Amino acid sequence: YIDLYIRDEIPGYEEKSARFRYLFGRLRTTAEDIVDRMAEELAESDFKPVAFELGFGGRDGTLPAITIQEGDATLSVSGKVDRVDGWLHDGKLYLRVVDYKTGRKSFDLSDVRYGLGIQMLLYLFTLEKEGQSCFGYPIVPAGVLYHPARDLILKTERDISPEALRKAMDRELRRDGMVLGDPEVLRAMEHSALEAPCFLPIQVSKDGGISGGVATAAQLGRLGQYVEKLLHQITRQLRQGNIDADPCWRGPQESACTYCDFASACHFQDGQAGDRLRPLKRVKADEFWEFVAHETGEEGRHGEF
């Protein structure tokens, strides 16, 4: 396919500069590696792609936009999902949302706690509500995954063994995210998930305990409520005209101001004229779920898979 692309889309390829041909060749190798890894993952899974570039809202959206109403204000969120994988089981379609990332984007519960990094969750929970009209089955949210789509560069010893190199590559390319912790679902996602997971963001102890990026069905249900609550809060703030300069801050290298396109117009100065940094604290998983339970009025209740 790449040879056909070169023939049809890049006339005079052989006359291009050596730098162009080198960079294109490197990009080609990276793309082929990504496709190979994706094929390897799907070969070990009962989850199969059911949609690509699935749109929410807009003129070409397959599903409606995510809409929140607050008084006379309406918030409409549209976008696209890179890929949706599904597993049909007992008359229900388990769906996971997959997003390709060329950088080192990670799924961080601390971000979600403060209303950041919730895009994939928005799509997942919208699929839960609206997906039956598209796919024909009741939808069960099964998780969100960031799929590495980048050139892999490792720092290793020169004489590293092929086996050790493979393990290092697997660690680097493991998916990041959150998945439904039901053992049957995990095994459907990756056949060896309960023994030696290679792709999923989970760890399995010697006694079979599962940890890492997992959540119960009850936790995902509460998380969906919390995300919707966040959207209502955002809508109210927009309706009230809130334009406070209070950027998120975790440190000098992790500030919303670092790469802000509007810095020259904002002139933010912490502590001056009402400007203030909004420090974000790291939260552990148990702290996060306790907070979500409190915010959704579910404290003291316990759900099963």
Tell me the role of every PLM-derived stretch.
Residues 1-305:
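Structural signature of nuclease core domains in nucleic-acid processing machines
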